[in-house]
Regions:
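Short, charged recognition helix plus adjacent turn
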Residues: 1, 64-72
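DNA major-groove recognition helix of helix-turn-helix/homeodomain DNA-binding modules
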Residues: 49-64
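Conserved hydrophobic/aromatic packing and binding residues within compact polymer-binding modules
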Residues: 11, 25-26, 36-39, 65
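Recognition helix of helix-turn-helix/homeodomain-like DNA-binding domains
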Residues: 31-44
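Residues within helix-turn-helix
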Residues: 23, 34, 52
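Short basic helix-loop element that most often maps to the first helix and adjoining turn
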Residues: 9-28
């Protein structure tokens, strides 16, 4: 699994743990809903700025987004 797919799966997992829909998270983070959906499917290469917005919206440290991600 690519790093982008692992990261997307991790974001989806954290979003679901907060019981947020993609729409909820996109509004809270200020990130386009379609972009966020693509990100969760591993189709985007997000910047640190975008990842930080998502982490803040999920109320987690940025490093939490990378937990469990294995380098290929």
């Amino acid at each position: 699994m690519t790093i982008n797919k692992q990261l997307g799966a991790r974001i989806r997992y954290l979003r679901q743990q907060k019981n947020y829909s993609i729409e909820d998270l996109s509004l809270e983070a200020g990130v386009n809903r379609n972009y966020l959906g693509d990100l969760e499917r591993g189709m985007r290469n997000p910047t640190l700025i975008i990842l930080n917005k998502i982490a803040l919206a999920l109320d987690v440290d940025l490093s939490v987004l990378f937990e469990g991600i294995k380098e290929i």
